[in-house]
Amino acid sequence: MRIPLLAPDNYAFPDPAYALAWCDGLVGVSGDLDAGRLLEAYQNGVFPWFLRDGWFFWYAVGPRAVIVPERLHVPCSLAKTLRNGSYRVAVNGCFAEVVAHCAAAARPNQDGTWIAPEFQTAYLKLHEMGYAHSFECHYPDENGKTRLAGGFYGVQIGRVFYGESMFALQPDASKIAFACAVPFLADLGVELIDCQQDTEHMRRFGSELLPFADFAERLRMLNAVPLKEEIGRREVACRGL
């Protein structure tokens, strides 16, 4: 299998359809993780998966797991927790901290993390540019002081939110953040959430599989349409529960 080497002065990607058919989804490798390359990747259904020997590996996954916000499913046990209301959810309150916690989180069947320092730096740059966002769930500790308990981060381009990674220091904290974030994003105009991988965790929230060609077409339509309002930095209320 020949792995395409991505040119440092050209952010274009090879056709993901070829990678899916012949290379197990591996689209190419690059020596950089520039913001421009990341944005080009997401808009074409490609994302960086890991760093090895100084090379960044870029993948496409198909069929693609996605969530359509209006079809979000909140499991009954989580809905009960949400109604309890002892938590607080915010967006973009502590982006770097969320990414660092995601990098440190233990993952089943994984040796270490793919979120190397180079990834953290790259996504912080996207955050500063207004593309990457974090959602945080806070809980009061034994002294009544509110502390970060879980959350997730991802990238928003147009009306698509590309989820990246989650963490939880307290049971259900990342799920609470996600359940509150989806209606919030929908209110701002987000029409599709990319889950990347087909996981049991996302299936509980109502994820569905799109053939990659259909997913790519949705991206072409939605990435060019701006949100009704910027995501910003604010409190996020859970509604409809």
UniProtKB/Swiss-Prot annotation:
Keywords: Acyltransferase, Cytoplasm, Transferase. It holds the Pfam family Leu_Phe_trans. GO terms for cellular component: cytoplasm. It is found in: Cytoplasm. The keyword Transit peptide does not apply. It is an enzyme of class 2 (transferase). The keyword Transferase applies. PANTHER family: LEUCYL/PHENYLALANYL-TRNA--PROTEIN TRANSFERASE (PTHR30098), LEUCYL_PHENYLALANYL-TRNA--PROTEIN TRANSFERASE (PTHR30098:SF2). HAMAP family: Leu_Phe_trans (MF_00688). This is Leucyl/phenylalanyl-tRNA--protein transferase. The gene is aat.
